[in-house]
Structure formats: C-alpha cells, structure tokens
C-alpha cells in the first residue's frame, strides 16, 4: 500500500510499505479521512521522542471495513489500544490502562496510509447520513466531550446557570467549547492570544472569544 512516512524532522516520504497484518479478530479498514493532530505536527518537527522515524503518523481516522462479516461498514477509529484485562479496562476507563498503546506510536503504525488494521471494539459505525470526512474528527471532539461530562458530574449540575471558560482556541479548545454548548452550557467563553484565530472563531460558533488580557476587565 501507499503511505506518508515520517522520515525525520521535517521530512515526509510518500512511498510503498507493507500492508497491515491482521492479528486475531482485527478488521482491515480502507482509510477515507485522517485529521492532522497537534501531536502529528510535534512529531514532524522532531519534538516527540515517542514517535521516532521511520513511522506512519496520524491517529484521527475514518474509513470503511473491506473484509469479513462487517465488510462495507463505515467506521471511525478509537486510536487507543488497551489491554482489556486490567482494573482500569474492566472498570470502563481503558484510557487509563497502564499498557495502552496508540496508533502512530511504535509498535502501531498510524493512519496516513491506504489501510489500517484495528479490533472491532475500537471501531464505531458511522451513520449513512454523516460524512467520513467529519467522522475522523470524533477522536479530538471526544477529548472535550469527556472533559465536559466529567466537569458536569463533579458540579452535580445539568448546565443551568453555569458559565464556562475555555483557555485556548485550538482544535481541542474549540471542540471543548462546542461540547459545552451541546451539553447545555449556555454561557461559554474562549480565550485565545492569536488575533487571526480570534477573528475566525468569532463567526457563528455560539460562544464568545476574547484575548487573554481582556479577562482582567
């Protein structure tokens, strides 16, 4: 298959690589869309020792299962591969699994390729009326969604009268702001130091955007 391979700081190569090997009940997925995470950029610039070259980056993935009983199912990928046996996993908190791995870090290659292999428990079927281009954003959106859900539980509130401040208007910050609104928080503010980003975010997102220095006012 073809893949975009990280070869070293600021070096990528589009080249032939071996097709994924299916282990056990893993599914082969033909990739449709992959997001570019901030961690991919850190790796590309050589700032992430956890991602040594050569390596296929990319973990925000959606695509279509191409073999087996689920062939044709459109899916989005949970990139976190947990052991399934430790206390965290059996408690439903596999994100805290001490043996967790993630695609785009050795030994798991990432999604900037034509195909990837994943276990069915790491796949969520995408509705027919939802684009795979949008579905690849499920993983970054889930970060903010999970944080909002935990915060609401800690406050013991449904959203009425709560005001929320999100520090940073990058991808995860915007996802958190949108998750706050979707979960019933009506007063949401985002602080962002970059003026161009502030101007962009002020258009039709349902939350207010200010510069950090304006908080003192």
PLM features: what roles do these ranges have?
Residues 18-34, 47-87, 127-129:
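Glycine-rich beta-strand-centered segment in the early N-terminal region that forms part
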Residues 39-45:
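Cytochrome P450 core scaffold surrounding the K-helix E-X-X-R motif
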Residues 83-164:
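NAD(P)H dinucleotide-binding glycine-rich loop of Rossmann-like/cofactor-binding domains
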Residues 131-214:
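Mid-domain Rossmann-like dinucleotide-binding core that forms the NAD(H)/NADP(H) cofactor-binding site
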